[in-house]
Amino acid sequence: MTGSHRQNGHREVLYIIACGSPLARDVGRLVELAQQDGWDVCVVTTPDGAKFVDRTAVARQTGHPVRTHYKNPGDPDVLPPADAMIVCPATVNTVNKWAAGITDTLALGLLVEAQGRGVPLVAVPYTNAAMATHPALQAGLARLTEWGVHVLFGDDVVPLHPPGTGERHQHTFPWARTLATLRPGCKEGPLVNASGSKGAPS
């Protein structure tokens, strides 16, 4: 283990929230790295994220069921409370809704509540160059950053690509860097916007 994610002898719990992107097929790689860092990992998907994630394989890997939908009234919680959350891959849809406080999916409800509880949050958008320039996304990322969410985004994370070519760039995705933001003493830089400049988008 390279991390020290333990409290009172128990492993701290990390939620990995996977959104609807082909990159979500590889979420098991992030799970493995997080487990090596000492986390007890749970995976939550958005409804579209569930289309890409092998739920059976991930449940076997984590020891927890993969959740997508709100539970029914009276049903018990099947996941332990989160000590930190990583949204990876984060889609434009989820970022925009999150920044607006919308909670129409389990993933968004968990994120909005976690922000109010002061849970450390990391967002790693994965999108194409055209969508990355949309004013709503730029404003949403700036708002999340202002609220204390650690956003990793831009050409120094994953080079932004033309529409329809995302799967060709998945092999370059820096899974380890994504997780490193939660390590004690991490000095990751500020958000990088779609143009590649430092600081929150304007």
What do the predicted segments below correspond to?
Residues M1-S202:
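A cross-family phosphate/adenosyl-ligand binding-site feature
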